[in-house]
Amino acid sequence: MSTLSPSVVISDDEPGYDLDLFCIPNHYAEDLEKVFIPHGLIMDRTERLARDVMKEMGGHHIVALCVLKGGYKFFADLLDYIKALNRNSDRSIPMTVDFIRLKSYCNDQSTGDIKVIGGDDLSTLTGKNVLIVEDIIDTGKTMQTLLSLVKQYSPKMVKVASLLVKRTSRSVGYRPDFVGFEIPDKFVVGYALDYNEHFRDLNHVCVISESGKAKYKA
């Protein structure tokens, strides 16, 4: 029987790191409070998640389904590690990729109104091991909606990998199968996570400042 994998738990009082200790684009210098998860730590954790995914799902054709846009960096890096394991294993499995785009945020709040605004023909998921890759689980409503949609196509197995899971009172209780980091209820950006389409070009996961929220508010 499969079990949910453990995660790196970041405490509520985690101070983070001073911005001056890292390379931060100058145009964001006044918009961030701190670096929360450095890029190197993200990569090391992602490498281990790839091993966990292959152990759990590596016996059958995997379709990796990326949730755009925020999931694309984590998706690309996770797949690089999975492909390395696959090509260096005595027993490799075929792997394909697909993409879907959802929208549930306005400014820093999850609206609860889930819109599917992209995606290919999901009938290709039938009979496959499906790995859904997401950047962050906040309330969990978005992922529950997507899981209901995916399961209509009768995949052999569905697992979810999320780089981040937020501890929040708004959560519906959903937890993905593979989690990189469990974080406090802060609005984070970077490593492709955005605030109204800004900050995707940061390498690190950072906490946005109040002035940053005001500057880029929709």
Swiss-Prot record:
Keywords: Acetylation, Cytoplasm, Glycosyltransferase, Isopeptide bond, Magnesium, Metal-binding, Nucleotide-binding, Phosphoprotein, Purine salvage, Transferase, Ubl conjugation
Crosslink site: Glycyl lysine isopeptide (Lys-Gly) (interchain with G-Cter in SUMO1): 115
Modified residues (N6-acetyllysine): 103
Pathway stated in the Swiss-Prot or TrEMBL entry: Purine metabolism; IMP biosynthesis via salvage pathway; IMP from hypoxanthine: step 1/1
Group of enzyme by EC: transferase
Pfam family of the protein (one): Pribosyltran
One annotated GO biological process: central nervous system neuron development
Family: Belongs to the purine/pyrimidine phosphoribosyltransferase family.
Xref: NCBIfam families: HGPRTase
Subunit structure: Homotetramer.
Protein's UniProt name: Hypoxanthine-guanine phosphoribosyltransferase
Species of the source: Rattus norvegicus (Rat)
Gene: Hprt1
